[in-house]
Amino acid sequence: MFVPSNIGWLVLSCGLFVAYWVLLAIYRLHFHPLSRYRGPRVAAVSNSWYEWYWNYYLNGQMIFEIQRLHKQYGPVVRIGVNDLSIDDPEVYQAMTKVSSGFTKDPHFYRCISFPGTSIGETDPAQSRIRRKVLTPALSGTRVQELAPAILVKVERLLRRVDLCAQSAKTICITSACKALTMDIISKIVLGREIGCIEEPDFRNSFIENLNAAFETGWIATAFPRLATLALWMASMSDFSSYLEVFDPHSAVYVAREDVNVPSAIAAHADRSAVIDMLMDPLTVKGHTVPSLEQLNDEAVILLTAGNDTTSNSMIFGLYQICNNMSVYKTLFQELQGHFPSVDQQITYEEAKQLPYLTATIKEILRLGTPLPGRLPRLIPSSGFQLYGQDLPPKTSIHTSPYLXNRHPSIWDNPNDFNPDRWLRKNSRDLDKYLATFNRGARQCLGKEWVHSYQIAGLWQD
């Protein structure tokens, strides 16, 4: 009787493994429901290595590769086993309607966020509750209340810039802008600022640790299990410096045995910061007070999202205005005409009425998209018809604010920085196609804050 040796078993196992992947590749390329759509064949066989190459190895270049693929193949490109990229403003409008039934793709969002947070929550019902809890802290009314404090922080930053200029010291505008926005968003989320503006060279370990953690996002979307292992290993080490900032604020609630007593909450929470609202069980019907770990997760997500997105747009805007003298002069003349003295108080509502300032900010947000990557959504159980073809439920449909804000059917000379496009007769039609803040039930809660940052920065600068 023949008894296979260890080498024989190894060869057999390898052969079966190779055969499995060959058959799987044949199925995905020729028999999968999405096989009719064109795109990179390697992506159709396996998302992981394709994403790793473009996003990690080439440092975030996948969105530009997808843009090239759309030019080659058209508005629909297969970019994964079960993934389609759509570059069509009208399809985007249909997908983002409140009644569309599209939901966040949990495979993607668990890689870039924490489960159960305002960004990471994929259940529509739970997401609505969390959004209702956070809305008061991020509303236009709250923007008005904190507008003077924002201007104080901008002035503090500019004083440091002036001191550097007097001593001929070079500063990093990226670090300066990120320090400003972090101090503002920490006030909104935690109830107090972290103090990044006062740090030497505007460098802060809190920001650097957050950036280091979220740089793993490129690996996470390609190899989710590896990312999970990396985060677990990080939690076992001393990589938790953000807790040193957040715990003093959350522990005062979590450590109390009477945390669910409304009177005790009311005595401690001024309801001005996100943490106060999260810890109040009466904030919204159906809201459950999160644990300390869940609070930390939400804080990290809000601080990171609020800092990176806003500061990147601000940096982009400053560059574009300084690089375009006609825009600079027109904007300066409008501001000087309405507010002759830099010491004059300017309110958020007054600034929103200035047409060229508003147009400039819209153009900054169009081209300097805070979140340029893909935002995948799952087709609902009822399915979805795309150009006459029925797509099966749970297919992941990817759209991108970067692509939507540059689509030539909507934007003439889409790569040109031109605030005047927002002052034409048909400019109101453009607003619904501005994909910067998403649309529908998933519209960005921080939209008003982004506008206020830009106004404060441009006015003072």
Swiss-Prot record:
Its cofactor is heme. Glycans are attached at residues 307, 324. The chain crosses the membrane at residues 7-27. Keywords: Glycoprotein, Heme, Iron, Membrane, Metal-binding, Monooxygenase, Oxidoreductase, Transmembrane, Transmembrane helix. Pfam families: p450 (PF00067). One of its GO terms (cellular component) is membrane. Its EC number is 1.-.-.-. InterPro entries: Cyt_P450, Cyt_P450_E_grp-I, Cyt_P450_sf, Cytochrome_P450_monoxygenase. It is an enzyme of class 1 (oxidoreductase). Signal peptide: none annotated. It comes from the Eukaryota. GO terms for molecular function: heme binding; iron ion binding; monooxygenase activity; oxidoreductase activity, acting on paired donors, with incorporation or reduction of molecular oxygen. The keyword Transmembrane applies. It is found in: Membrane. It is a single-pass membrane protein. Heme binds at residue 444. Pathway: Phytotoxin biosynthesis. Belongs to the cytochrome P450 family. Cytochrome P450 monooxygenase; part of the gene cluster that mediates the biosynthesis of the phytotoxin solanapyrone, a causal agent of early blight disease of potato and tomato. The prosolanapyrone synthase sol1 is a polyketide synthase that produces the octaketide desmethylprosolanapyrone I via sequential condensations of 7 malonyl-CoA units with one acetyl-CoA unit, and one methylation step. The octaketide backbone is further methylated by the sol2 O-methyltransferase to yield prosolanapyrone I. This is Cytochrome P450 monooxygenase sol6.
